[in-house]
């Protein structure tokens, strides 16, 4: 069985987790999320590379650089979820299976957050489970990749 490399992208303002609106996003920091993902990745015999940026272009460049390097992407694009056609197009261009995750349930929040440009090019979307959304996203992408491998 192939060991998969998964890119985890955290978008704008996620570097403030633990301080920013804990009533919505919880008290866990981004470093703690990354540690949890690294530990879960070891259990699944995969590797994760975590990148956070507040800049759309850096996120896009990182997606482009993932081509041929990573077999899956987990992305929490933050507010770019609802605004960035460019991130959507980058994900579509590289054709790397992607799971979109959100800490909060975006459909229980402001109406403008109900639309995702990423969802149509992702294999799935997980939201509303706090830090668990990331863990579920990792489990989902690994299961998807293993099924894909077994079907070939």
UniProtKB/Swiss-Prot annotation:
The record marks 20 as: Transition state stabilizer. It comes from the Bacteria. Pfam families: DHquinase_II (PF01220). GO terms for molecular function: 3-dehydroquinate dehydratase activity. Keywords: Amino-acid biosynthesis, Aromatic amino acid biosynthesis, Lyase. The active site is at residues 25, 102. It catalyses: 3-dehydroquinate = 3-dehydroshikimate + H2O. Gene3D superfamilies: Dehydroquinase, class II (3.40.50.9100). GO terms for biological process: amino acid biosynthetic process; aromatic amino acid family biosynthetic process; chorismate biosynthetic process; quinate catabolic process. Pathway: Metabolic intermediate biosynthesis; chorismate biosynthesis; chorismate from D-erythrose 4-phosphate and phosphoenolpyruvate: step 3/7. Its EC number is 4.2.1.10. Substrate binds at residues 76, 82, 89, 103-104, 113. It is an enzyme of class 4 (lyase). Belongs to the type-II 3-dehydroquinase family. Homododecamer. Catalyzes a trans-dehydration via an enolate intermediate. NCBIfam families: aroQ, PRK05395.1-1, PRK05395.1-2, PRK05395.1-3, PRK05395.1-4. This is 3-dehydroquinate dehydratase. It comes from Gloeothece citriformis (strain PCC 7424) (Cyanothece sp. (strain PCC 7424)).
